[in-house]
Amino acid sequence: MNASLAKRYAKALFDLAREQGTLDQVEAEVRLLDEVLHATPELMDLLTNPAVSDSELAQLLKDSFGDMTAIVVNTLLVMVENDRAAEVRALPRYVRELINDYRGIAEGIVTSAYPLSATDLKDVELVFGQKLGKTLQLKNVVDEEVIGGLRVQVGYTTYDDTIETKLTRLERELLNA
């Protein structure tokens, strides 16, 4: 897979959706596309199989995603036509990143020892959103190895306030003292 190629197609799709005022619909459709590709690895196998012709792939995509907006379907078809079907897998992620960036939204993960309530999750989103100057959409991941505290990852930035990290820092300070 060539990420830069997938990003180019994502940018073209994003630009068209923005111009046409269909960002919400395109966002929903690429989320669905992502879910379908995750749920059916056989589809990805077909898209990357050199024995399957471009016309067969195009028909498969029309049959599978023909109810989506024309710009989404046409983007998929152009990718197949240009022998870029393998990049279809990455398209939804890059489109969502562009849409989120345009809207000032960042997605991330908050790791905790136990599931956070909806209220606690919103509080974490607000606090870290203010630090980053963005609206955050965090997904809570439970990691039983986290004794307590939180680890928040947004993009390439990690805020680690777990007890494990605090103990590690304390140990280093004591050893260096």
Swiss-Prot record:
One of its GO terms (molecular function) is proton-transporting ATP synthase activity, rotational mechanism. The keyword Cell membrane applies. The keyword Plastid does not apply. It is found in: Cell membrane. It is a peripheral membrane protein. Keywords: ATP synthesis, Cell membrane, CF(1), Hydrogen ion transport, Ion transport, Membrane, Transport. One of its GO terms (cellular component) is plasma membrane. InterPro entries: ATP_synth_OSCP/delta_N_sf (IPR026015), ATPase_OSCP/d_CS (IPR020781), ATPase_OSCP/dsu (IPR000711). It comes from the Bacteria. PROSITE patterns: ATPASE_DELTA. NCBIfam families: ATP_synt_delta, PRK05758.2-4. F(1)F(0) ATP synthase produces ATP from ADP in the presence of a proton or sodium gradient. F-type ATPases consist of two structural domains, F(1) containing the extramembraneous catalytic core and F(0) containing the membrane proton channel, linked together by a central stalk and a peripheral stalk. During catalysis, ATP synthesis in the catalytic domain of F(1) is coupled via a rotary mechanism of the central stalk subunits to proton translocation. F-type ATPases have 2 components, F(1) - the catalytic core - and F(0) - the membrane proton channel. F(1) has five subunits: alpha(3), beta(3), gamma(1), delta(1), epsilon(1). F(0) has three main subunits: a(1), b(2) and c(10-14). The alpha and beta chains form an alternating ring which encloses part of the gamma chain. F(1) is attached to F(0) by a central stalk formed by the gamma and epsilon chains, while a peripheral stalk is formed by the delta and b chains. Belongs to the ATPase delta chain family. This is ATP synthase subunit delta. It comes from Exiguobacterium sp. (strain ATCC BAA-1283 / AT1b). The gene is atpH.
